[in-house]
Amino acid sequence: MASSSYTSLLVLVALVTAASAQLSPTFYDTSCPRALATIKSGVMAAVTSDPRMGASLLRLHFHDCFVQGCDASVLLSGMEQNAIPNAGSLRGFGVIDSIKTQIEAICKQTVSCADILTVAARDSVVALGGPSWTVPLGRRDSIDANENEANTDLPGFNSSRAELEAAFLKKGGLNTVDMVALSGAHTIGQAQCSTFRARIYGGDTNINAAYAASLRANCPQTVGSGDGSLANLDTTTANTFDNAYYTNLMSQKGLLHSDQVLFNNDTTDNTVRNFASNPAAFSSSFTTAMIKMGNIAPKTGTQGQIRLSCSRVNS
């Protein structure tokens, strides 16, 4: 069984490598030279209006790539959007739809929704003060979505460190450092009370007591009461993309159980310490991991399609 699993992983890595080799940062230079500027403008406007939108677009990209690859399947109405990790919490669809409409007006059926979402994730990080990176382009859009895979493959807010590592390794090419670096995306954004209630009411011992008490003020213990109340994932610089997430973990101020397990007398502690003390190391590792994640099983060539509307397949 172990040998079979290892062989399957090698096959997945080979397929990912082959597909990602067909991507290029210059893919739209001739066919739609205004594409990247249009995406950037749309993201900047959205994040300026609502800083939380930066985290929402970044999360949308993550939830897309972890389910059958970076193919914009998460943007299709229903299906993956109804999966337990996504229902009632994914945001940013309107921003992507608006950008797609603008691009269709200048380059009809040329730029994929998958590429728009991937670039928008990068531009969201930059808009909130984070690092930039070169995005390989040329992804095509899926013609289906997979709710079951979304339920099984997306890491949960109560995941253990081992479960997180398994989820990332399963995607081919992502390692433990990538996992810790990508978790640093929680330096921006918010989470609902229902995702951290158990942690602040005695479910976890590795939480700062004063921090837990402050969270209880807006997150009642009773299930069904205040479930949607929001708290910042980063308690210090919520709307700035920096390395404060890691210093928070070292103070036992990780909002989610799946955050704090990264610094809990375990194998990832040293990586957290490194990112907390060295912002450049975090930025470098994060951008590397984002490129690797963006290269998970892209559809290229004649695979899939270029959707006219991101929320539905072409008729």
Curated annotation (Swiss-Prot):
Top-level taxon of the source organism: Eukaryota
This protein's record includes keyword Secreted: yes
Co-factor(s): Ca(2+); heme b
Compartment(s) of residence: Secreted
Protein name per its UniProtKB record: Peroxidase 1
Residues at which Ca(2+) 1 binds: 64, 67, 69, 71, 73
Biological classification of the source: Eukaryota, Viridiplantae, Streptophyta, Embryophyta, Tracheophyta
SUPFAM superfamilies to which the protein is assigned, alphabetical: Heme-dependent peroxidases
Site (Transition state stabilizer): 59
Residues bearing glycans: 158, 265
Keyword set includes Plastid: no
Main subcellular localisation: secreted
Disulfide bonds, paired cysteine numbers: 32-107, 65-70, 113-310, 193-219
Segment forming the signal sequence: 1-21
A GO molecular-function descriptor: heme binding
Described function: Removal of H(2)O(2), oxidation of toxic reductants, biosynthesis and degradation of lignin, suberization, auxin catabolism, response to environmental stresses such as wounding, pathogen attack and oxidative stress. These functions might be dependent on each isozyme/isoform in each plant tissue.
Binding note for cofactor: Binds 2 calcium ions per subunit.
Enzyme active site: 63
InterPro entries reported in the protein's UniProt record: Haem_peroxidase (IPR002016), Haem_peroxidase_sf (IPR010255), Peroxidase_pln (IPR000823), Peroxidases_AS (IPR019794), Peroxidases_heam-ligand_BS (IPR019793), Secretory_peroxidase (IPR033905)
Chain residues that bind Ca(2+) 2: 187, 234, 237, 242
Organism of provenance: Hordeum vulgare
EC number: 1.11.1.7
